[in-house]
């Protein structure tokens, strides 16, 4: 049986697709990430006013489209008419995806378009709650086994864990991460029980180094994978792989794929 964790490690994640090279969280961005070697597509979801689960990072559409306002106040008909390539620019001057028909996709469309990829889905919206609606989309696409559900906020993650009953892999919310890093700092693991399947964190936060040899080793002892975001420099990718992380998320997934490939070749 194939699952979210079936592909070999280290895992190559396309962060919002190949968002350094194409409009984030769109089908062209995801397709480019796959072409560049990503086995995993990281994305974010919200709901429209009429309940469609759409792939979008922000609660508003202003930053990535030619529209404005909260996605929760737009119907799917209105959201799907927006130009999701309108704001993308690699150089700050040219906008190659404007007017090219790039649209905000529904989660169901991404699942259908990329049946061989694993999806890392962050549920951004807490109110009104959309966990059940996301699960319904996953069940309809028979994709529960190839996704990991993530959430930054503790209340959303609690809702996820309550709803899934162990059927879907999960990440760790802020509260989980704080508790884990505190354990690493104190080197006290008495009574610790992991709540998720993967610790997905940046290398550092608020001046505190999070990804260290100690935290990687502790994660592995606890049965957790450790995935690091969002890394867009080859030297930093190499450093993290040297530490033994299980996956790297990047806006430029080709950099991660190249580093992983070279390691496999060098090891025979």
Model segments located where?
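Metal-dependent phosphodiesterase/phospholipase catalytic core, i.e.
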Residues: 3-4, 9-10, 57-167, 192-222
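Hydrophobic packing residues within well-ordered alpha-helices of enzyme cores
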Residues: 51, 134, 160, 240, ...
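Solvent-exposed polar/charged
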Residues: 35, 39, 112-113, 162, ...
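Active-site mouth loops of central-metabolism enzymes
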Residues: 14-24, 94-102, 171-179, 205, ...
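C-terminal active-site rim and adjoining tail of enzyme catalytic domains
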Residues: 174, 180-268
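Conserved N-terminal beta1-alpha1 strand-loop-helix module at the mouth
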Residues: 7-57, 62-67, 72, 78
């Amino acid at each position: 049986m194939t699952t979210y964790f079936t592909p070999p490690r280290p895992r190559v994640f396309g962060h919002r697709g190949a968002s350094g090279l194409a409009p984030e969280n769109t089908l062209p961005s995801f397709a480019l990430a796959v072409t560049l070697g990503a086995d995993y597509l990281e994305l974010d979801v919200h709901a429209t006013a009429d309940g469609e689960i759409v792939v979008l990072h922000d609660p508003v559409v202003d930053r990535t489209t030619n529209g404005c306002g909260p996605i929760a106040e737009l119907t799917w008909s209105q959201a799907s008419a927006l130009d999701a390539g309108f704001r993308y620019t690699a150089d700050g001057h040219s906008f190659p995806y404007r007017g090219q028909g790039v649209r905000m996709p529904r989660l169901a469309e991404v699942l259908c378009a990329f049946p061989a990829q694993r999806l890392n889905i962050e549920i951004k919206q807490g109110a009104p709650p959309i966990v059940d609606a996301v699960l319904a989309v996953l069940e309809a696409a028979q994709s529960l086994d190839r996704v990991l559900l993530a959430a930054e906020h503790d209340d959303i993650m609690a809702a996820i864990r309550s709803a899934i009953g162990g059927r879907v892999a999960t990440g760790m919310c802020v509260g989980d991460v704080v508790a884990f890093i505190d354990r690493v700092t104190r080197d006290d693991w008495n009574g610790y029980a992991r709540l998720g399947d993967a610790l997905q964190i940046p290398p550092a936060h608020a001046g505190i180094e999070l990804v260290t040899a100690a935290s990687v080793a502790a994660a592995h002892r606890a049965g957790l994978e450790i995935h690091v975001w969002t890394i867009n420099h080859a030297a930093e990718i190499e450093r993290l792989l040297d530490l033994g992380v299980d996956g790297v998320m990047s806006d430029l997934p080709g950099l991660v794929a190249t580093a992983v490939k070279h390691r496999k070749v060098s090891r025979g």
